[in-house]
Design a protein with these regions (language model features):
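Extracellular/luminal ectodomains of secreted and membrane glycoproteins with large N-terminal domains
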Residues: 1-6
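Conserved eukaryotic protein kinase-like
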Residues: 7, 11-392
């Protein structure tokens, strides 16, 4: 009995020792792999920073005296009074109001050092540096100092178009009257026409939306935020793209569903059309919170009104001239949001239609309901394409 007990205890001790040794060994392996992963990430971080630095230096060398001014981080802190006056914040970082030495006001976009690998930053600097147009925001300078990055723009007193579209007022009066809305829509169209045709290198924006349209003191619109832009030669009708670019609600169908057509400058046309419809309605194009289900998809509801030659019932229309202006903006936008890219007009044609007479516009085909979900965009980014299109 005693020998049996001793044998059992001996085996138990061996098992316990073995379990402890296995646990220690496993912990050592986990620690080893953790250190290796951290070392790899650290190495990639510094390699990425070094690559970004080389790209910036190459950019400055190529542009010479035409490159925007480069500021160091201490100058950025000084012009923003140590980041005292914050204008806004987003996933990219924060925007602060600043003042240059000559007294001019600027908006300083300080990028989040943890977001992205610097590609969007370099992309924006390179894109805007190629532009010079009244309807495109001007880059006053930039800061690139290690992981500290900032973009310095001319200050726009009226902020983004977004706040003038969706913010409700108790008296149900539009914040922007129809003459200004038309002026803004036409200005954005001219800015996009310039990006597509007026630059030596064609610039496709890929993120046209109210938030990215800034307004100066006279409500002159400026296209901003070129972080997702793509540069291509004018002779290129179709561009290659590895992942989805843009914002849900404004993304052209072909960007998510490649079988619908090639990605091109017509993708910006679609985003423009969706944005102008929101300007017209003072609401999101897809809104499940409306009273009547027929109004959930705003473009379809507007199409029905025009097809039946009924009043658009839009807020703030005071006379026949404004009624014609609103109807024209809707008609042009419905052409812009056609699912087939080949059916959409170029931005040059959009400008022509907006400047022309309403009775010269033909009735566009009925629009399809197309609104990609976040899961569809995510699936595109990992290489699979899904599509959702329905006639409503």
């Amino acid at each position: 009995m005693f020998n049996l007990y001793s044998l059992i205890m001996h085996d138990f001790t061996l098992l316990s020792t073995g379990a402890v040794l296995c646990t220690v060994g496993l912990l050592v392996l986990l620690f080893f792999f953790r250190e290796k992963i951290l070392r790899y990430k650290c190495l990639r971080f510094w390699e990425s920073n070094a690559e970004d630095h080389q790209n910036i230096e190459a950019f400055l060398k190529n542009y010479g005296s035409y490159a925007p001014k480069r500021y160091n981080y201490s100058e950025v802190k000084r012009m923003t009074s140590c980041f005292k006056n914050k204008l806004g914040q987003g996933g990219y970082g924060s925007v602060y109001k600043g003042t240059l030495q000559n007294g001019s006001h600027v908006a300083v976009k300080v990028l989040n050092g943890l977001k992205g690998n610097g590609e969007e930053f370099i992309n924006e600097v390179a894109s805007i540096s190629r532009t010079s147009h009244v309807n495109v925001v001007s880059l006053e300078g930039f800061c690139f100092e290690g992981c500290k990055r900032a973009l310095i723009y001319k200050f726009m007193p009226n902020g983004s178009l977004e706040k003038f579209i969706y913010e409700e007022r108790s008296d149900s009066v539009r914040q922007l009257g129809w003459p200004i809305l038309y002026k803004v829509a036409l200005g954005i169209a001219r800015g996009l026409e310039y990006l597509h045709r007026g630059c030596t290198t064609r610039i496709l924006h890929f993120d046209i939306k109210p938030h990215n349209i800034l307004l100066d003191e006279d409500f002159c619109p400026k296209i901003s935020d070129f972080g997702l832009a793509k540069l291509c030669m004018k002779k290129e009708s179709i561009v290659s793209m590895l992942g989805a670019r843009g914002t849900i609600g404004y993304i052209a169908p072909e960007i998510v569903c490649r079988n619908l057509g090639g990605v091109s400058h017509k993708s910006d046309v679609y985003s423009y059309g969706m944005m102008v419809l929101e300007m017209v309605g003072g609401r999101k194009n897809v809104d499940v919170g409306v009273d009547r289900t027929s109004e959930i998809y705003f473009p379809h509801w507007l199409y029905q009104r025009i097809e039946l030659d009924e009043e658009l019932q839009l807020i703030g229309i005071m006379n026949e001239e404004e009624k014609e202006c609103a109807r024209k903006m809707v008609m042009v936008s419905l052409w812009c949001i056609q699912t087939d890219p080949s059916n959409r007009p170029s931005m040059s044609k959009v400008v022509e239609m907006l400047e022309g007479k309403l009775d010269s516009l033909q009735m566009p085909p009925k629009p399809y309901l197309y609104s990609p979900s976040r899961s569809e965009v995510d699936s595109l980014e990992v290489g699979s394409y899904q599509c959702s299109r329905s006639n409503v």
